[in-house]
Amino acid sequence: MASVNIKPLEDKILVQANEAETTTASGLVIPDTAKEKPQEGTVVAVGPGRWDEDGEKRIPLDVSEGDVVIYSKYGGTEIKYNGEEYLILSARDVLAVVSK
């Protein structure tokens, strides 16, 4: 995972989607047109967090760079940067962190 010059704002998270499965458990090859959009990815960058209600302290996020996360199927904004595809998600679109 290369370093990226994109710094998310507030509670936003930059994720690079993990590759979708290319074969089934029985060995059948899945064509690109039939693959489901992946819902798992690696966190590349994390914003500093939202401000609290008083505007005095930032509320830190529950994820950090390098975490593998599962995110909402339709959440986030897809972007392309330096030939790579990324997803910018709000912290609320992250459903779980996968344990290593």
UniProtKB/Swiss-Prot annotation:
GO molecular function: ATP binding; metal ion binding; protein folding chaperone; protein-folding chaperone binding; unfolded protein binding
One GO term describing the cellular component: cytoplasm
GO biological process: one example: chaperone cofactor-dependent protein refolding
Pfam families, per database record: Cpn10 (PF00166)
CDD domains assigned: cpn10
Subcellular location: Cytoplasm
Entry-linked SMART domains: Cpn10 (SM00883)
Keyword Acyltransferase recorded: no
Keyword Lipoprotein recorded: no
Location, primary (coarse class): cytoplasm
Keywords of this entry: Chaperone, Cytoplasm
SUPFAM superfamilies given in the database record: GroES-like (SSF50129)
InterPro entries, alphabetized: Chaperonin_GroES, Chaperonin_GroES_sf, Chaprnonin_Cpn10_CS, GroES-like_sf
Subunit structure: Heptamer of 7 subunits arranged in a ring. Interacts with the chaperonin GroEL.
Function noted in UniProt: Together with the chaperonin GroEL, plays an essential role in assisting protein folding. The GroEL-GroES system forms a nano-cage that allows encapsulation of the non-native substrate proteins and provides a physical environment optimized to promote and accelerate protein folding. GroES binds to the apical surface of the GroEL ring, thereby capping the opening of the GroEL channel.
UniProt family annotation: Belongs to the GroES chaperonin family.
Stated name of the protein: Co-chaperonin GroES
